[in-house]
UniProtKB/Swiss-Prot annotation:
Laticifer. Its main location: other. It comes from Papaver somniferum. Belongs to the MLP family. The lineage of its organism: Eukaryota, Viridiplantae, Streptophyta, Embryophyta, Tracheophyta. This is Major latex protein 149. It is found in: Vacuole; Cytoplasmic vesicle. GO terms for biological process: defense response. SUPFAM superfamilies: Bet v1-like. Pfam families: Bet_v_1. PANTHER family: POLYKETIDE CYCLASE/DEHYDRASE AND LIPID TRANSPORT SUPERFAMILY PROTEIN, POLYKETIDE CYCLASE_DEHYDRASE AND LIPID TRANSPORT SUPERFAMILY PROTEIN.
Amino acid sequence: MAHTRGISGLVGKLVMETEVNCNADKYYQIYKHHEDLPSAIPHIVTSAKAVEGHGTTSGCVKEWGYMHEGKTLTCKEKTTYNDETRTICHSISEGDLMNDYKKFDATLVVDPKDNGHGSIVKYILDYEKINEDSPVPIHYLALCNQATEDLNTYLCASV
């Protein structure tokens, strides 16, 4: 896990990489086909639906429900996909995150491991805090890590 801050202290980036046992395409596809996430990791993702466009097409808008620190929270975001690089970018525009951040982008990149067994899952959180009192979103990176590990368990069990 790495953290870098922008010059102003308001802008920053958090990066996390986790090794998983599952195939990179399988891991990427469950995130792309987001409707399966609430049944795969219901203790983290409580709902996921496309509200504009087709949910697997770049430019679609999705609404998410998720659990964080014992609370049910929501967000609305625009999603872009790059199937070739197995990259998904969520640009959050509405919801609970916007109470602390002017900008919040969560990028997921899934790469196959060089040995052909398993994958590397990378989350990149780019953010701009509303003010100095807004927290660095390390707790959201921890949530991403938990989702990665739990989804790995789910996907490997369903093989």
